[in-house]
Amino acid sequence: MGQDVFLPIGVFIALLIVWEVAVQLFGIPVYLLPAPSVIWTDTVAIAGTIGNHTLATLGTVVVGFFISFAISLPLAVFMTSSPLISSAIYPLLVLTQSIPKVALAPILVVMLGANELPRLVITFLVAFFPLVIAIAVGLVAVPDELIELGRSFKASKLQELYRIRLPYAVPFIFSGLKVAIALAVVGAVVGEFVNADKGLGYMIITATAFFKTPVAFGSLILLSIMGVVLFQIVVIIERIFFPWSAANQETTIG
């Protein structure tokens, strides 16, 4: 456990040191590649402002993520209820996923208005596909022996879902949740690039427009930290409430 935590931190610190030394050694201009020390100083100088923008992005990420989960779960159940339904819906899901979200964002602004809604829709769309697919795969991955066992006890379709399929699908669901929460951060920023007056994506666009590259890098680093923290929250929830699922995934990865 300690190695899993301290090794990445050590590598990250080493990269920061190399970055700092390289910038100083080669005299790279601040507007091209600021040193980590400059990024830290300039970001801390506007801590209050950038904190508010961080909370704005976090709100969009969390709301969009929960909406994607709330829709993905029943849709996956519906899809897997019949091969015919799955064949009808799956191509539509692939179609929506293949649409570039950066190209879709300005269209959504025109359709839905210059407000929070387009950003939420983009966040939802980015997080939705991997989640619904992961849940659907988990629901149909149940061994036939378990299904036959349930039917031998005269389990109804609803009981089969709640007592067999959903518990078996938990590791798949959490795999999808981990991917979805990371992608939700990306979706929120894409939405902010196109239409926003707040958020870290807005900060990056504004900072680069005025050549405040350290602030842009600071915002980018905060986005990365946000993604890692949210990912770890999902991991912790899985370990606390579904320890057998977490152990199963760790064994599979290991």
Model regions and ranges:
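Transmembrane-helix boundary motif in ABC transporter permease subunits
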Residues: V63-L93
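Transmembrane alpha-helices
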Residues: V121-L125, L158-G191, G218, L223
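Periplasmic/extracellular loop-to-transmembrane helix junction in inner-membrane transport proteins
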Residues: G2, L25-I67
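Membrane-spanning helices that line or support transport/gating and their immediate boundary helices
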Residues: V77, L84-P91, A134, G138-A141, ...
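Short cytoplasmic-facing helical segments at TM-TM junctions of multi-pass membrane proteins
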Residues: L131-A134, G138-V179, L200, I204
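C-terminal transmembrane helix and the adjacent membrane-cytosol boundary/short C-terminal tail
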Residues: P83, P171, F217-G254
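N-terminal signal-anchor transmembrane alpha helix
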Residues: Q3-L25
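Generic hydrophobic transmembrane alpha-helix motif, especially the helices
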Residues: V94-P130, V137-G138
